[in-house]
């Protein structure tokens, strides 16, 4: 499988500061296989050979996958239209998740790409509880309380664009709120 786009998306997430350090993870489903970032990896420094491979049942074929593997697998098992998952801890979205504030979709772009944002109550990172809460949501754009965001798409590019638009709309919400004082 050609993983050039996968690596490009990981590098973009890091370069644009949607992830820092070893935070965040990315996966792509192709047939019965899931290509996923390794645990503890820095997305900006990943190469194709670093990507882990797991089957949809959870059997590890290659590497040591992210601690959020269960979340990715549960999403794929419960949402057949999803082939890509991006999970980040972007600054503005995470700040709003900590404050438990809902975002307004102020722009046409946000309405088109995001449609509706789902909000997930706090669940500990890497747990089956988090995996079940996230995978049971109807929305493809999710804000996880005190944690970050998850965006879903039929392609990695689609999931990435949702991440980018969501962080921009969070920045816009912050600006609007500061003017409103």
Swiss-Prot record:
Zn(2+) binds at residues 68, 87, 89, 147. SMART domains: Aldolase_II (SM01007). Involved in the biosynthesis of the coenzyme F420 which requires phospholactate produced via the aldol cleavage of L-fuculose 1-phosphate and the NAD(+)-dependent oxidation of (S)-lactaldehyde. Catalyzes the reversible cleavage of L-fuculose 1-phosphate (Fuc1P) to yield dihydroxyacetone phosphate (DHAP) and S-lactaldehyde. The active site is at 68 (proton donor/acceptor). Its cofactor is Zn(2+). This is L-fuculose phosphate aldolase. It is an enzyme of class 4 (lyase).
């Amino acid at each position: 499988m050609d993983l050039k786009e996968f690596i490009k998306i990981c590098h973009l997430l890091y370069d644009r500061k949607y992830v820092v350090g070893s935070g965040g993870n990315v996966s792509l489903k192709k047939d019965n296989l899931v290509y996923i970032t390794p645990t503890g990896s820095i997305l900006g420094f990943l190469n194709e050979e670093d990507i882990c491979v797991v089957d949809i049942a959870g059997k590890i074929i290659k590497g040591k996958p992210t601690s959020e593997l269960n979340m990715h697998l549960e999403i794929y098992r419960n949402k057949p239209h999803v082939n890509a998952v991006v999970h980040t801890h972007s600054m503005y979205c995470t700040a709003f998740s900590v404050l438990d504030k809902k975002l307004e979709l102020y722009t046409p772009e946000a309405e088109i790409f995001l449609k509706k944002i789902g909000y997930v109550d706090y669940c500990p990172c890497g747990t089956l509880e988090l995996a079940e809460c996230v995978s049971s949501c109807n929305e493809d754009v999710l804000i996880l309380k005190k944690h970050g965001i998850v965006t879903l798409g039929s392609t990695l590019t689609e999931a990435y664009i949702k991440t980018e638009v969501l962080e921009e709309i969070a920045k816009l919400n912050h600006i609007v709120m500061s003017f409103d004082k």
